[in-house]
């Protein structure tokens, strides 16, 4: 029996328990392992046909298998959730978002529709600079309330973990405020957040023409304060022609690593700039965007532990060429896909749109895209040992679909087919009329 399809906009919790027995599953589909999957192996999912069951105890998966074989002692005190024949996949990991920001840039979107480029708008004082002004003027409460709207929508689409970056402050006070909002959000809603410091998103107006001085300001003043307050675990930078060069990137990321941060990089988005090679050399968790990655960059990532995080909704929004996902997978890269939610180049956190673009325009299979959005997304934030697959010992993060097979994620174009999102055993069911 098929579940009624949900409305994506309204989410209610139906079961709040860390001990949960999920029964009557039509099919379980998951990648397996504790690290990123490279190349064509991304398409090799572990499939369990139903009637299947999953047991979560104390928020951790304790059983995955046939419903008829569930040990009775495992489910004695469990809340029961009936999947009604729906497929179950791992909770989605959105490994690249700019979740916390002030203001909107709807007029810039109209300018791009009329032919203006993203970089021309940015160089004219729009783009990141306009969001920086609005974010600096926003209160903690305003930033938190705006982010909550996006998080509720993301939860309804199956996201259980997300990266959240700062980078719209670019001064000490506002960068700390953004990260404090992320910390508050972690305590006030279900999605687990991975906090990333991205003060090096651009050079702010007060450092205009002095980008190297700005990097030193981040290294000497901002990063140590972020570290001492425990507000972020990762450091990111926009390595791009006209933004930050390789020398500046090395300076910031090497300093961040010495302080105990993991590393990420926005790389090769606008022009081929050798960012992928540099990310692999520095041991970044991920190199993100990669619309203009070179052959050398593909080879470097394929021979490294750095995940290639692709952001198809951004290419779609910018009317840009998509990252060469098919070539990257065929040459052995570990690929993740993520939303890049932000107020400028991609005002969307739509999992259905992202999934369809990856399959239709980037040449990825339904299986590869599922791996990219789960286990490889988890690896891109350093959490593949804890989340990203449905295996005993991992966190109880699941998505119950309204259809009996995961392939409907790409087949039912543009539609949210998530019936329920399960986070650590707590069930959040989309509102159904």
Region annotations inferred by a language model:
Residues 126-148, 152-153, 160-273:
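Metal-coordinating catalytic core of metallo-dependent amide/deamination hydrolases
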Residues 155, 227-228, 257, 280, ...:
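Non-catalytic positions within long, well-ordered alpha-helices that form the structural scaffold/packing
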Residues 262, 272-389, 401-408, 413-415, ...:
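Active-site-adjacent C-terminal substructures of enzyme catalytic domains
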Residues 25, 54, 59, 85, ...:
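Divalent metal-coordination and catalytic microenvironments
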Residues 78-146:
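Metal-associated gating/positioning segment near the N- to mid-region
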Residues 10-72, 408:
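N-terminal metal-binding scaffold of metallo-dependent hydrolase/deaminase domains
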Residues 21, 78-82, 195, 421:
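Conserved beta-strand scaffold positions in the cores of enzyme catalytic domains, especially
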């Amino acid at each position: 029996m098929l579940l009624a399809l949900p409305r994506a906009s309204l989410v209610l919790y139906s079961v709040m328990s860390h001990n949960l027995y999920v029964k009557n599953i039509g099919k379980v589909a998951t990648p397996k392992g504790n690290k990123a999957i490279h190349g064509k192996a991304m398409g090799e999912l572990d499939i369990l046909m139903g009637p299947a069951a999953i047991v979560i105890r104390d928020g951790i998966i304790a059983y995955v298998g046939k419903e008829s074989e569930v040990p009775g002692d495992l489910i004695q005190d469990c809340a029961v959730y009936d999947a009604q024949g729906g497929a179950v996949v791992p909770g989605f990991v959105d490994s690249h978002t700019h979740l916390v920001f002030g203001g909107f840039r709807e007029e810039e979107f109209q300018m791009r529709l009329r032919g203006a480029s993203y970089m021309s708008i940015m160089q004219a004082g729009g783009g990141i600079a306009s969001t920086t002004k609005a974010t600096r003027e926003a209160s903690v409460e305003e930033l938190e309330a705006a982010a909550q709207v996006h998080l509720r929508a993301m939860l309804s689409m199956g996201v259980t973990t997300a990266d959240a970056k700062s980078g719209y402050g670019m001064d000490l006070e506002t960068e700390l405020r953004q990260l404090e909002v992320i910390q508050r959000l972690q305590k006030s809603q279900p999605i687990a957040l991975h906090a990333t410091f991205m003060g090096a998103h651009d050079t702010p107006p007060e450092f205009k023409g002095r980008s190297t001085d700005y990097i030193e300001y981040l290294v000497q003043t901002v990063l140590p304060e972020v570290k001492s307050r425990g507000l972020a675990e990762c450091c990111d930078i926009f390595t791009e022609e006209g933004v930050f060069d390789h020398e500046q990137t090395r300076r910031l990321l090497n300093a961040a690593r010495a302080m105990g941060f993991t590393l990420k990089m926005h790389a090769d988005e606008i022009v081929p700039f050798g960012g992928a090679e540099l990310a692999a050399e520095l041991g970044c968790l991920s190199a993100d965007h990669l619309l203009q990655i070179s052959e050398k960059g593909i080879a470097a990532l394929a021979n490294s532990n750095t995940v290639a995080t692709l952001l198809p909704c951004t290419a779609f929004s910018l009317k840009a060429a998509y990252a060469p996902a098919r070539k990257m997978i065929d040459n052995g890269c570990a690929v993740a896909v993520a939303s890049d939610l932000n107020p400028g180049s991609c005002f969307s956190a739509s999992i259905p749109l992202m999934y369809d673009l990856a399959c239709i325009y980037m040449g990825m299979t339904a299986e590869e895209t599922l791996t990219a959005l789960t286990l490889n997304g988890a690896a891109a934030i350093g959490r593949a040992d804890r989340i990203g697959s449905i295996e005993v010992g991992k966190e109880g993060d699941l998505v119950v679909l309204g259809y009996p097979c995961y392939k409907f994620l790409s087949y039912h174009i543009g539609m949210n087919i998530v019936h329920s999102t399960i986070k650590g055993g707590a069930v959040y069911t989309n509102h159904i009329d």
